[in-house]
């Protein structure tokens, strides 16, 4: 995983300036690591060995102007989106409104807005769709889609207003409307369990399928991002069991053990209808569960937005950011058990990459991505701690271990003997766990350095020695 953190002096611009850049961008041949030429610019991967690009930006709150500018920056950092969408295309945008309108009353939210912590935030939806329209997509050819738990979740929380304001259409995937009936969309010869899925025909008709999930842990699937969001692409009535409306029990349990069958279902849904573009909402979110109906749920604020044309790569970085191991054969569940890793399954079939070394990070938020991995500890930490680095002295890299007992923003920096900041290794929200981080000091001179960790009221420092 390489971070392209070229400085972005100003990632906000006026609507007029942005629109004027669209006409010029198509004729600009951009070099790698440069600021992109606008939404119409072609994606450039060059021969750098990367299989995918994930754009990252930071945002701490959901103001309309901020989110609009941030999503625009994501698209530009990807080199534009003209390689996945044309102005004449029909586009489906899948949101996540899991749990329905009554979720807002759950005590585990602790007063938080359900749109902030559990659902796709309406301002992220608005920003994506406004940019699509600015790009040239006809508004009536944009379809907001979701299999609703109840109509109120769409009508009363801003999603209907956005759809109407922009002149788009909404389709409830629980129903065949506006078509006469559902259709079966095949998964193909690489299926894991299902040969086809019953779906609204709109998912077969659109040229571009976009997923805008909420960045979350999942109690049964480990992580839920853009690909897991597709569980909500099939009608509830066709995949429940024993009349359990609201829960697609057959997708969880029909094939036997849930830790195997649910990942198979998720992967098969992607085979039936792959994504063309994904934007992950992690400005505010939740950890340890996908919703407050699960014991252990906690509100969180990761403060980031991510986007990619490779949904597997996007979910890989998102899973990694939330403390998971996206490269393994299994994903850890919040209760300590594990399930099959559907990212690995799809990557093995060539639908994208879940290898960190094959993913280039771009955008002005790459430093928010945690350059750490979970340490192999079985006991959850009881207090914050920062351990001495090893090896020490070192050249050119060294590893530090640290513990996070509760969800908290963790800041880890390297400073020199004069107290001058050399590098920020971490500045992001992290969930409970033990972690290890590696610092590469190739660019720095020999000498004494200090690594400082701050988390809430906790502050600690260790002395480290670089010898060359």
Locate the predicted segments by residue.
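N-terminal and secondary-structure boundary signal
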Residues: 2-370
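Short, surface-exposed loop/turn motifs with a glycine/proline- and acidic-biased composition
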Residues: 426-461
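Short beta-strand edge segments in extracellular beta-sheet folds
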Residues: 465-468
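Glycine-centered coil/turn sites that cap beta-strands in beta-rich domains
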Residues: 371-390, 394-413, 436-442
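Ser/Thr-centric signal marking residues that sit
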Residues: 120, 398, 424, 461
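Short, glycine-anchored, charge-dense loop/turn motifs used at functional sites
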Residues: 415-422, 449
